[in-house]
């Protein structure tokens, strides 16, 4: 069944706004697991704008599920990842001026560096994912780099405003899923997904995992953290089951 990775970055964003000790991302991670999260995702950025090094080290030994650590392809971040040894590392692009990750990693344009990073992490026993746009060229480059997993950037789908654009972007994601599977890759997806748009993506056969954070944190203000996580997971599972029944 499709899995939910709960991204806790914006729990840390709220904390860092006042440099307080609360809300605690560790507590958010453990509560998310209790509410049905299949893994916990967190992004240690170079600018440390939300998740801090201490969060990563504190959360890692406490999780009962998987830790998916997002980080840039830099010596510092790769060193931290190898020290922490999460089950998964997702390599992502970073710009200091961006509000959130603006696009996928250009694997094709940095083939050697990404390949070296994938090999380094794999030798440390870490499964590597590459966060890329739903583009055949990038998928092929990810396969050449030796990454066993890709995460498709769903931002363009999430930002599409009219039905024609939504359907076009969804078709693009669907084609990318098929291309990833053709290369023997595990295919995940995420970015910009929320309670109103997640089901169309969750219904796509071949997507193993969705990573979602901002929408869950936002909804938790009104519904509470546990319910926000449970409701997102329920939407995903319902969509996948309906799709399976439709194909039967």
From Swiss-Prot:
Catalytic activity, reaction form: 3-amino-2-oxopropyl phosphate + 1-deoxy-D-xylulose 5-phosphate = pyridoxine 5'-phosphate + phosphate + 2 H2O + H(+)
GO CC, one annotated term: cytosol
Protein name (database record): Pyridoxine 5'-phosphate synthase
Cited function: Catalyzes the complicated ring closure reaction between the two acyclic compounds 1-deoxy-D-xylulose-5-phosphate (DXP) and 3-amino-2-oxopropyl phosphate (1-amino-acetone-3-phosphate or AAP) to form pyridoxine 5'-phosphate (PNP) and inorganic phosphate.
Main location: cytoplasm
GO molecular function: pyridoxine 5'-phosphate synthase activity
Record-linked HAMAP family: PdxJ (MF_00279)
Keywords, comma-separated and alphabetical: Cytoplasm, Pyridoxine biosynthesis, Transferase
GO BP annotations listed: pyridoxine biosynthetic process
SUPFAM superfamilies: Pyridoxine 5'-phosphate synthase
Organism name: Bordetella pertussis (strain Tohama I / ATCC BAA-589 / NCTC 13251)
A Pfam family annotated for this UniProt entry: PdxJ
Biological pathway: Cofactor biosynthesis; pyridoxine 5'-phosphate biosynthesis; pyridoxine 5'-phosphate from D-erythrose 4-phosphate: step 5/5
Presence of keyword Plastid: no
Matching Gene3D superfamilies: Aldolase class I
Catalytic residues of the enzyme: 43, 70, 191
Residue numbers marked as site, Transition state stabilizer: 151
Subcellular location, record wording: Cytoplasm
